[in-house]
């Protein structure tokens, strides 16, 4: 199981929620993050344990990997 840090941001780039999850893959972390995002979420950032950016998504777009 891999560890992913998920950060939910609003339009002003303020952190709405931040969580650490254990998932089998980045795809599973993306699905989980999308499901748990609130209506106020503008951007979702996913990074690994050492805060290396792995993927991000804006509310109106698709996932993009860094």
Over which residues does each language-model region extend?
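Short, mixed-charge low-complexity intrinsically disordered segments
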Residues: 38-66
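A short, charged, amphipathic alpha-helix used as a generic interaction element across diverse proteins
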Residues: 23-43
């Amino acid at each position: 199981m891999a560890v992913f840090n998920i950060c939910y941001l609003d339009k002003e780039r303020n952190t709405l929620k931040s969580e650490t999850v254990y998932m089998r893959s980045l795809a599973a972390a993306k699905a989980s993050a999308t499901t748990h995002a609130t209506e106020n979420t503008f951007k979702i950032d996913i990074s690994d344990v050492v805060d290396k950016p792995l993927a991000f998504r804006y509310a109106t777009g698709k996932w993009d990997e860094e």
